[in-house]
């Protein structure tokens, strides 16, 4: 049997064995893909460790979140402009008669106070032993003799003023009251020869004695009511009867 016909087959087997041992599958696919086929991929291995955090990304657009809960009520706002007045309502029914209070409660507090004040003034008037009333004035005296300044102070103490006749009737009442010459509430202390009352008003009534006022001695700044009802100017430092007038 001849060996030559089997020689080519033997050489081919040797080349194939040698190539399979030295060449990888990847290289074989590159060099001889049509001849040698690689086997199927192996099983996946275990997951590796987490990598490091990447760089911070850019801010995203606002998302559409869920609607939140209703918040608490806000502060009370300023009052609005007043509205127009409404039309008058219907007339109500007639009420029952009220009950009048009894005794002292029938007087309001202001009325009681006024009454108490008036009673206090009357008590002061009663401290004088004599008095005359003309119209809405009381002319009263306690019979004391004193200077003009003391007469003014006495009358002020009793919430009164020095007697100042405004007409013949008042002048006559004071004349009938006195038994001594009395000071009147009239002076020319501020302007010589210009007699005024103690509030500074010019006189609208006078009843000067003949030849008066004459300012004898250059210091007669006060006025005296004589027993005959006429007036005379005298020094304010002299002492005479005190007569006060009280408005009523």
Swiss-Prot record:
Residues 43-113 are annotated as: Disordered. Residues 112-130 form a coiled coil. GO terms for biological process: complement activation, classical pathway; complement activation, lectin pathway; positive regulation of phagocytosis; surfactant homeostasis. Residues 49-61, 93-102 have a biased composition (Basic and acidic residues). Its main location: secreted. Oligomeric complex of 3 or more homotrimers. Interacts with MASP1 and MASP2. Interacts with MEP1A and MEP1B and may inhibit their catalytic activity. This is Mannose-binding protein C.
């Amino acid at each position: 049997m001849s060996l030559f016909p089997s020689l080519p087959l033997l050489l081919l087997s040797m080349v194939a064995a040698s190539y399979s041992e030295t060449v990888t599958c990847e290289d074989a696919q590159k060099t001889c893909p049509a001849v040698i086929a690689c086997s199927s991929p192996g099983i996946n291995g275990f997951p590796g460790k987490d990598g490091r955090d990447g760089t911070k990304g850019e801010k995203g657009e606002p998302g559409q979140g869920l609607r939140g809960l209703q918040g608490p009520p806000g502060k009370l706002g300023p009052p609005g402009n007043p509205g127009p007045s409404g039309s008058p309502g219907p007339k109500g029914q007639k009420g029952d008669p009220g009950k009048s209070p009894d005794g002292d409660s029938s007087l309001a507090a202001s009325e009681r106070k006024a009454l108490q004040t008036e009673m206090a003034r009357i008590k002061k008037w009663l401290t004088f032993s004599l008095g005359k009333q003309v119209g809405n004035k009381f002319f009263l005296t306690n019979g004391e003799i004193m200077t003009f300044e003391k007469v003014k102070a006495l009358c002020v103490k009793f919430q009164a003023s020095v007697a100042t006749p405004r007409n013949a009737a008042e002048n006559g009442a004071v004349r009938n009251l006195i038994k001594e010459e009395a000071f009147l509430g009239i002076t020319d202390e501020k302007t010589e020869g210009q007699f005024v009352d103690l509030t500074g008003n010019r006189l609208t009534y006078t009843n000067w004695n003949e030849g008066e006022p004459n300012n004898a001695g250059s210091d007669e700044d006060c006025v005296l009511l004589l027993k005959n009802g006429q007036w005379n100017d005298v020094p304010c430092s002299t002492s005479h009867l005190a007569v006060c007038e009280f408005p009523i």
